[in-house]
């Protein structure tokens, strides 16, 4: 046997309720010893692991308060109970055959697997009242081959990891608890949904603020560029005025400087041509 054993099919097989149908049909037309025999056959049948429909048969319900109430209580035990409950009060039930005891142990494993997906060997040994690990592993493997659980045995850590567990019968009155549990789950979902909606509204509001800020910053940049462009244009015009200004304020321009010297080219000759009169 390897240290880790992966067991079970990938998908659960056909519902075990179909195997119970023939016993329900027999119970409808049986009374007395014949009915008790039908119940014992159902308890020993290798493919029957649910008993709710058989318990609901009128002929079976009549056994509850009669001299054969142990058969009813035993059927009730297999539908909802565990092996430890049987061991605690064996006088309440009919004497179980080895096949019946093993089936009740298998059903006990199913009950544990429904509550937790990781089950220590120590808990299984206690619930099944087994003191031998090899015997325990054999019981688990038989339950897996019966297709009521799928899982993996970790022998080093002594843990059964459950991947799938068949459901058991729902006890009378338990439906109300299921409704309450589902309602609590719905309320929790509503609360989470409201919280998510609030977060979405907050995120949208923050997004709107960021868009507004982005538009404002972009507009500020556009305005700043306009101001800078205007200042640059004014500076260029001022520089042009400073460059041409002296020629228009009474000073001599370059063209004038070139022309004026020609009038004073020979001052002496100009003086000779002057006539004086007395």
Curated annotation (Swiss-Prot):
Disordered: annotated span: 233-278
Superkingdom field: Eukaryota
UniProtKB keywords: Cytoplasm, Developmental protein, Differentiation, Nucleus, Oogenesis, Phosphoprotein, Signalosome
Gene Ontology biological-process entries: COP9 signalosome assembly; female germ-line stem cell population maintenance; germ cell development; germarium-derived cystoblast division; male germ-line cyst encapsulation; protein deneddylation; protein stabilization
Signal peptide feature range: none
Compartments (UniProt record): Cytoplasm; Nucleus
Principal subcellular localisation of the protein: cytoplasm
GO cellular component: COP9 signalosome; cytoplasm; nuclear periphery
Record's keyword annotation contains Cytoplasm: yes
Any Pfam family hit: PCI
Similarity comment text for this entry: Belongs to the CSN7/EIF3M family. CSN7 subfamily.
Chain's role: Component of the COP9 signalosome complex (CSN), a complex involved in various cellular and developmental processes. The CSN complex is an essential regulator of the ubiquitin (Ubl) conjugation pathway by mediating the deneddylation of the cullin subunits of the SCF-type E3 ligase complexes, leading to decrease the Ubl ligase activity of SCF. The CSN complex plays an essential role in oogenesis and embryogenesis and is required for proper photoreceptor R cell differentiation and promote lamina glial cell migration or axon targeting.
Subunit and partners: Component of the CSN complex, probably composed of CSN1b, alien/CSN2, CSN3, CSN4, CSN5, CSN6, CSN7 and CSN8. In the complex, it probably interacts directly with CSN2 and CSN4.
Protein's name according to its UniProt entry: COP9 signalosome complex subunit 7
Native source organism of the sequence: Drosophila melanogaster
